[in-house]
Amino acid sequence: MVAAASVVVAVGTATGILSALGDDGGGADEARPEVTRSPRLESLPVLPSPSPSPSASATPSPSASVKKASPSPSPKPRKRSGKSGQEAPRTTPAATRLYLHPRSQVLDWVRAHPDDPRQDVIASRIADRPAAVWFADYTPATITSRVRAVTSGGAAEGRVPVVVPYAIPDRDCGGHSQGGAPDLDAYDDWIDRFAAGLGSGDVIVVLEPDSVAQADCLPAGERADRFASLSRAGRVLKDANPNARVYFDAGHSGWHAPAKQAGWLKQAGAASAASSDGIFSNVSNFHATADEVAYDRAVLDALGGPASLGAVIDTSRNGNGAPSGGEWCDPDGRKLGRAPTLSTGLGRVDAFLWVKLPGESDGCKGKPGTFTPSYAYDLAR
């Protein structure tokens, strides 16, 4: 999801993602990283003003490797389920606090190192804050139970979990985060199973990072098929749980122009209340919050759709904005951004989220996707 003006870099946003895994089929979730690279999304300081933050770098994130996507053959036309009728505008969830999933690498480290001098800082500033749970492995047989383990945990505490389905075919354009379902028919089935685990409580779904912003690596026909599957996915998720809030990929402020991104989002169903509650941006990146706020509002304006559509922003590592030069791999000098919250105080901004868990390496300060305490401490202190 790292892209510069006219150059899209085939690097995924999911470096160091946490996947809820559980091979026992019983839904026991263990947050575990996928060994993938995430594109750099730059975090922005959260300011009530939509104007760009002066500290934010406009430089797009650099490419780790410009790898041409090797898209799979276009799938044959398929029947798509999911209602297309309009739904009433969403309302604010009854739950007002985000859910902290009890299993993650950072929590494991904190529990295992009570005497480490960095433990208090890492525990209080990272481990104790809610972060998204990623589902990046294509495992149809267990996906329902694993999603249910997270959503039921949130419901039991009266809190809102954040889940990230990340299994679209040809994800990351065949780059470092490649993987996902073998084809769109299989993906549609996987999403049906994912939706079956959402339950009936409040939940935020960050639907397929990179899937829209990075779609220009696909031929036009395959891009249209992907967008049709994403639109269907949004409808299926919201049909399964009317309290689910589904957000679509808007890239980040250093990537596509708002009008271009909005055009693709519209094709993917993001302008319809039947499938969408809005957009997300800055996943795994570092762009300043103020820049993302301004960008997201511009995208929403260009997108049209119901006035209820809003944006959620990944603020996990954007406390100092993006580094000069567009470095994306564990750049020095970055800090934690705004704490996760559903109360931003900003119009059209529904939440600040930690979609990327701070301290999980992009691959330069530790193995890709693994929790690295020295990196976490640098971000948090």
Regions found by a protein language model. Name each.
Residues 1-7:
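N-terminal export and membrane-targeting signals
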Residues 131-138, 177-182, 212-223, 247-254, ...:
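Surface-exposed cleft-lining segments at the edges of enzyme active sites
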Residues 108, 112-126, 255-374:
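Surface-exposed substrate-engagement region within the catalytic domains
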Residues 149-246, 262-264, 275:
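Substrate-binding cleft of extracellular glycoside hydrolase catalytic domains
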Residues 20-119, 176:
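N-terminal low-complexity, Pro/Thr-rich disordered segments
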Residues 94-102, 132-133, 161-163, 203-207, ...:
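Hydrophobic faces of well-ordered beta-strands that scaffold small-molecule active sites
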Residues 9-19:
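Hydrophobic alpha-helical membrane-insertion segments, chiefly the h-region
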Residues 91-193, 197, 357, 361, ...:
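N-terminal carbohydrate-binding/catalytic regions of secreted carbohydrate-active enzymes
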